[in-house]
From Swiss-Prot:
Function: Catalyzes the reversible isomerization of glucose-6-phosphate to fructose-6-phosphate.
Annotated organism of origin: Pseudomonas fluorescens (strain SBW25)
InterPro entries found in the cross-reference section: G6P_Isomerase (IPR001672), G6P_Isomerase_C (IPR023096), Phosphoglucose_isomerase_CS (IPR018189), SIS_dom_sf (IPR046348), SIS_PGI_1 (IPR035476), SIS_PGI_2 (IPR035482)
UniProt keyword list: Cytoplasm, Gluconeogenesis, Glycolysis, Isomerase
Name the record gives this protein: Glucose-6-phosphate isomerase
Length: 554
């Protein structure tokens, strides 16, 4: 039976029991000692593929650990699950849908059937539609109501319609097409709308309304505000079509808004929002970096898709990263995972991976609705590396929690300044090294004595300078951030998340927890505005409503 129909109790599997026993044997394992004892440790636990180099040698693992984790992947049927994902089977069981973000990266000529229909012609038809629009805007042929060419594009969307595209367009800023600036409007907070429109001219601005339903509250409210702003700036209803296009599956609602049917880019129910940057949701990416670079992004993701599907688990980046996450979350008690990019342009990757990982694997029931038998997705957090060193890295080094980390760093900078990049790279490596090595009491005391500090002060200060070490991390190195390598990097994390969902027996492609807040939000809004007079379901919410109503002005 398919894994999504009959999820297992992973804790009852022999491979899980073997890992439990191995974890006890690893209680006193020291990475420092392991490196000293084995000069080949680095080469044994590194991997290169798809333009990415992965060093996972600074982990609480031996070759036996890797073998046992791979054994777990095999025992849960990961290979069959990967094949089910790629074949378009309904792996999103709660909604009865496939999850075919990988299809968006497949080359023209491939065939893939969903409900008996080959979807690949439609995928490439939309890609051609994107190509046409991007060409017209970049060539200055798409003009606003005063016949001036478009200079600014605003993507109105939230969640997956925002985080992925923003990550990619900013990560690839060095590839940006000159003459067109891309902006993102996600938050319903009016301050964000105000600050953005202060920088724009309506006559040269194009808005992309990205919403599958064309009914997402935040997106629709911002689209309505943008429309009102456009009209107030001198635009007309008759010329609205020049300034608004949509990415949606609800054509009727988009047309009613004033968008022409030929300017609506379709979405499919077999692509989830957090996996959708490869689709027409990626239109702002293509406008930002050009169509050839957008296709390189897709190509890089496709190479990772092939690697994930075909590489043996022992040499498979997404599989290994997923298994390491299971190792720490389920056997070492880790509750969170840090993403630490040492690259200014990758500063938003943590936000995208938060949604990708936490919305996918933040589940407490298995595919069949029964409770999970173990912890599932971790909290994902982090930020730009050097900045973090002067903020929260202290917790990583001397805190009481075990927090695995991924360091991501390029070898070459697009903007070299003196020896800055050498220092950036050195900082990245030294942080992972410090997490692994730590500092012993003996080393701390010797360091203080070398500074001529009196012995009584040495004994007082030494405990504060001890750093436990033995803290795990992965280091991902790319030669330089490019569309192809970035595509591979993002796809790698997508597949890592899927690996973990299969092991835990959960559905990585629904998000019912998000819906409850939306439903309750309508009732709260109605009570805030006086449209609903009945009390809220609880005294706390009602008290906060009353507090707002008694003080709100404007």
């Amino acid at each position: 039976m398919a894994y999504y129909r009959t999820p297992h109790d992973v804790t009852a599997l022999p491979a899980w029991q073997a890992l439990n026993q191995h974890r006890q044997a690893m209680q006193d394992f020291s990475m420092r000692e392991a490196f000293n004892a084995d000069p080949q440790r680095f080469s044994q636990f590194t991997l290169s593929s798809c333009g990415l180099f992965l060093d996972y040698s600074k982990n609480l693992i031996t070759s036996e650990t890797r073998d046992l984790l791979v054994g777990l992947a095999k025992e849960v049927g990961l290979k069959d699950a990967i094949n089910s994902l790629y074949a378009g089977e309904p792996v999103n069981s709660s909604e009865g849908r496939p999850a075919l973000h990988t299809a968006l990266r497949r080359p023209v000529g491939d065939k893939l059937s969903v409900n008996g229909v080959n979807i690949m012609p439609d995928v490439h038809k939309v890609l051609n539609q994107i190509t046409d629009l991007v060409g017209r805007i970049h060539d200055g042929l798409w003009r606003g109501y005063t016949e001036k060419p478009i200079t600014d594009v605003v993507n109105i969307g939230i969640g997956g319609s925002f985080l992925g595209p923003e990550l990619v367009s900013e990560a690839l800023l060095s590839y940006a097409h000159k003459g067109v600036r891309c902006h993102y409007l996600a938050n319903i907070d009016g301050s964000e709308f105000h600050e953005l429109t202060m920088k724009l001219r309506a006559e040269t601005t194009l808005f992309i309304v990205s919403s599958k339903s064309f009914n997402t509250l935040e997106t629709l409210k911002n689209a309505q505000a943008a429309r009102a702003w456009y009209l107030a700036q001198g635009g007309s209803e008759a010329e609205l079509y020049r300034h608004f296009i949509a990415v949606s599956s609800n054509n009727a609602a988009a047309v009613a808004f004033g968008i022409r049917e030929e300017n609506i880019f379709p979405m499919w129910d077999w692509v989830g929002g957090r996996y959708s940057l490869w689709s027409a949701i990626g239109l702002p990416i293509a406008l930002a970096i050009g169509m050839s670079n957008f296709k390189e992004l897709l190509s890089g993701a496709y190479t990772m898709d092939q690697h994930f599907q075909n590489a043996p688990f022992e040499a498979n980046m997404p599989v290994l990263l997923g298994l390491l996450g299971v190792w720490y979350g389920n056997f070492w008690g880790a509750q969170s995972h840090a993403i630490l990019p040492y690259d200014h342009y990758l500063r938003n990757i943590t936000k995208h991976l938060q949604q990708l990982d936490m919305e996918s694997n933040g589940k407490s029931v298995r595919q069949d609705g029964t409770p999970v038998a173990t912890d599932t997705g971790p909290v994902i957090w982090g930020g730009v590396g050097c900045n973090g060193q002067h903020a929260y890295h202290q917790l990583l080094h001397q805190g009481t929690q075990l927090i695995p980390a991924d360091f991501i760093v390029p070898i070459v900078s697009f903007n070299p300044v003196s020896d800055h990049h050498q220092w950036l790279y050195a900082n990245c490596l030294s942080q992972s090294q410090a997490l692994m090595l730590g500092k012993t009491r003996v080393e701390a005391e010797a360091e203080l004595r070398d500074k001529g500090i009196p012995e009584d002060e040495v004994q007082k200060l030494a405990p504060h300078k001890v750093i436990p070490g033995n803290r795990p991390s992965n280091t991902l190195v790319v030669e330089r951030i490019s569309p192809r390598r970035l595509g591979a990097l993002v796809a790698m994390y997508e597949h890592k998340v899927f690996v973990q969902s299969v092991i835990w027996g959960i559905n990585a492609f629904d998000q019912w927890g998000v819906e409850l807040g939306k439903e309750l939000g309508k009732g709260v809004y109605n009570r805030l505005t006086g449209a609903e007079e009945t009390s809220a379901e609880d005294a706390s919410t009602q008290g906060l409503i009353n507090y707002f109503r008694g003080r709100h002005r404007g």
